Amino acid sequence: MKGSLVSDVFLTGEELANKVRKLLSGRDVRAAVAFIGIDYASALEEMLGKGGKVVCDVSMGATNARALDAIRKKYPNSIRKVHGMHAKVIVGASESLVSSANLSRNALGLTEQPGRLVEAGLLLNKESEGFRRLEDWFDSLFLSGEP
């Protein structure tokens, strides 16, 4: 487990929200999130336009289905639905984040206003065993999801 704990970072509040936004703006990002709010639809669309993939749950009604359907028409092979998805994981090129935060205004706020919920997350670097396990987990989950 070389390096698995050396540079892991615990994030909360605005620091967490900023890291989520930064990760989503990268290339080939993979995100598994329970819910995607309407305020984060454009960030999701931008992420998918850069080769990203997303897994989410639409069955509980918290993800904006109309926004997701519009994005799916543009990127049909980049979105998968998994019933019961409750994890919040973002895998970037050099960092991965496991957190409590959905992609929503309540959780992360917007750039000019903070979120209303108390959220926390753990950032893992690419050298950690956890990072590699998250990559494998996401890829397996994506393959098993419904288009």
Spans of features found by a protein language model:
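Primarily the HKD phosphodiesterase
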Residues: 6-75
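Signature of lipid phosphatidyltransferase scaffolds
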Residues: 8-9, 13, 98-147
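Short beta-alpha junction loops
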Residues: 57-62, 85, 127-129
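General small-molecule cofactor/ligand-binding pocket signal
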Residues: 77-82
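Short beta-strand scaffold segments in enzyme catalytic cores
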Residues: 86-91, 120-122
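Short hydrophobic-aromatic micro-motifs
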Residues: 90-92, 96-99
